[in-house]
């Protein structure tokens, strides 16, 4: 089969050898897929934890299910394994600093970015909020996919924060 015009082959060919593909090439290829940015929050006792996640997706409309994929080495992974609930805050275009903060990147000091909804922490001013009860967790590769049933949803009218090819972009960029 001929390669579609305009595509550059980085690896592979007739005898595809996945061992030849390195993580950087894989990440670069996936970087061509624009994603929204979320902060996944959870509570452990009186402590609130949050982690920046762009591996977020809807799974089902009936019942309403979403999934987040969390690296098993992340502190948030251990916390999610101890709880039965998580929040998803879809970040707006004005919240890049919060994405960086929860990704452990250098960011300006963040002063209490959370609001409480039904006693659960969510990022203040986000594009949308979900509160989910964990239905199932699947360990796959070096991540765990946490599937949650949506119990609360709220939406604000603003533009999303997007990530494409290793940088933040806006709609129309």
Where do the PLM segments sit?
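Basic, polyanion-binding surface patches
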Residues: 4-173
């Amino acid at each position: 089969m001929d390669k579609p015009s305009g595509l550059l082959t980085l690896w592979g060919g007739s005898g595809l050898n996945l061992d030849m593909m390195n993580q950087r090439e894989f990440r670069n290829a996936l970087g061509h897929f624009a994603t929204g940015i979320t902060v996944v929050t959870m509570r452990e006792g009186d402590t609130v934890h949050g982690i920046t996640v762009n591996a977020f997706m809807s799974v089902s409309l009936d019942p309403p299910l979403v999934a987040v994929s969390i690296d098993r080495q992340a502190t948030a992974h251990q916390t999610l394994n101890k709880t039965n609930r998580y929040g998803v805050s879809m970040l707006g275009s004005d919240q890049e600093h919060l994405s960086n903060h929860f990704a452990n990147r250098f960011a300006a000091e963040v002063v209490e970015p959370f609001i409480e909804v039904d006693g659960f922490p969510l990022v203040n001013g986000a594009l949308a909020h979900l509160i989910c009860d964990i239905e199932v967790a699947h360990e796959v590769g070096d991540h765990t996919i946490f599937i949650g049933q949506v119990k609360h949803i709220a939406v604000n009218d603003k533009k999303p924060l997007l990530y494409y090819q290793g940088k933040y972009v806006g709609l129309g960029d």
